[in-house]
Amino acid sequence: MDIFCIAYGFQEPVRLLRRYPGRFPLMHVKDIRKGTVLGGSPADVREDESVPLGTGLVDVRAALLAAQTYGVRHLYLEEEAVDAVPQIRQSLRYLGGLR
């Protein structure tokens, strides 16, 4: 499950995890810039619409909690920014703060 693409398509990752427990063993974790117009194909997403975790539209915390409950076994931090390293560092700090 790619929570960015799910949210971009007007769906809620938590709802899908709850509805299909065990169906998603892998999760790509990525956030969407606030103000991004949602809908359409995830293939149309621009690189600048991906932001560090916890700063965008996706309820990352809720998705991660649901992932633990409903059978996600592996998480992958996905970052598509041209200068991805600073955003990855910020996302890792966010994840570390969720403990």
What do these predicted ranges mean?
Residues 1, 7-99:
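Histidine-acidic metal/acid-base catalytic patches
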